[in-house]
Amino acid sequence: MSSTKDVADHHLKAFLAGDLDETLKDYAEGSVFISPNGIAHGRDEIHAVFNRLFAGLFAPGTYTFTVDMEHCEGDVAYTLWLAECADAGIVLGTDTVVIRDGAIMTQTVALKLAPKG
């Protein structure tokens, strides 16, 4: 079984590579993804979320991403991050994941956009 840190690290690496299939490997069928845009239930809906992200704001090769802080405690991993994207800066981003049996069961995301121009 993978540790919380192992799964969180794999998830970040897959996300930064823009690898949709590898990113989705971290989720269980019953996973929930919660963001300011709503709640996605299960792999199919989470697939759609990441497909939009990789086609838009986080299109591979179009942004820089900086991890400011990471904490793992038990089955919870927290990441504080910043990004500079083509159309906006993200001055504050956070992800919290709850990992059980080697898979992300729940993920929350929050971010503060600073539009360019």
Regions found by a protein language model. Give the residues of each.
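Short, low-complexity N-terminal intrinsically disordered segments enriched in polar/charged residues
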Residues: 1-29
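Terminal "cap-and-tail" regions of soluble proteins that handle hydrophobic small molecules
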Residues: 2-7, 13, 43, 47, ...
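Short acidic/polar mixed-charge low-complexity motifs
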Residues: 39, 87-91, 103
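Short, surface-exposed coil-to-beta transition loops
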Residues: 63-65, 89-95
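Residue-level signal for tight coil/turn positions that link beta-strands
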Residues: 73-76, 101
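Short beta-strand segments that buttress and anchor functional surface loops
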Residues: 78-86
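Short beta-strand edge/turn micro-motifs at domain boundaries
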Residues: 92-117
